[in-house]
Design a protein with these regions (language model features):
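Transmembrane alpha-helices and adjacent helix-loop boundaries
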Residues: 1-231
Length: 231
């Protein structure tokens, strides 16, 4: 009973006293906002990069744009996301005071590099005969891509895009390095107030785990549904 009283006191100190649970609530809200908007930015940019890259692969066009995209992919995929976040915060967007906006841009630019390769592989996985069929119907290149190729590619890559969302959710845990309140930072602030590391950090880990498990379950259900639709 003594140990249960001790645990109750620790839970009270960490979450109830001075409404400390609000650090977790606010942090979780910011984490979700950053992840959603960063993924949206990543998908838009990633699709544009993928279309440039596949256009170059298919017909050799857009050589300069393709070169820029290749350099972008090499830099983003070859450097740690934390360094990218710090460079964007301290150098590129040093005058921007909205830290959530900075984080969205940093994680969105990072995500775009991975989304681009997912989309590109999805487009390339669509049978070349589909492309030729579109052209034979009198559609030009961009119409064929928009009406025939991309709708099929999206179906192929949806699970991979959702997995990218899950990866990005976990990556945002470094947002605290720019002094921003995210879920991880919220737990760390409680730790610094109570000098108790175990309970707040385990709570943060459990929240991430529950969200990731729910999203992973959604991905599995989607994959099963897509497979059953193909039969």
């Amino acid at each position: 009973s003594g140990s249960s009283i001790g645990i109750k006191e620790k839970l009270y100190d960490n979450f109830v006293k001075d409404n400390r649970y609000m650090y977790i609530v606010k942090g979780l809200g910011n984490t979700i906002v950053i992840t959603i908007f960063a993924v949206m930015l990543g998908i838009v940019l990633g699709f544009l990069i993928a279309i440039v890259r596949t256009s170059h692969d298919r017909n050799g066009g857009l050589a300069i744009l393709n070169g820029i995209c290749k350099a972008y992919l090499t830099i983003i995929r070859g450097t740690p996301v934390m360094i990218q976040l710090l460079i964007i915060y301290y150098v590129v967007l040093a005058s921007v005071t909205n830290k959530i906006l900075v984080a969205v841009i940093a994680f969105g630019l990072n995500s775009a590099a991975y989304v681009a390769e997912i989309v590109r592989s999805g487009i390339m996985s669509v049978d070349i005969g589909q492309f030729e069929a579109g052209r034979s119907l009198g559609l030009n290149y961009s119409q064929t891509m928009k009406l025939v190729i991309i709708p099929q590619a999206v179906k192929n890559i949806l699970p991979a895009l959702l997995n990218e969302f899950i990866s990005l959710l976990k990556e945002t845990s470094i947002s605290g390095y720019i002094g921003m309140m995210d879920l991880t930072k919220g737990g760390d602030i409680i730790r610094s107030n109570t000098y108790e590391a175990f309970i707040p950090l385990i709570a943060v880990a459990l929240i991430y785990l529950v969200i990731v498990m729910l999203l992973s379950h959604g991905v599995s259900k989607l994959e099963r549904r897509l497979r059953s639709n193909e039969r």
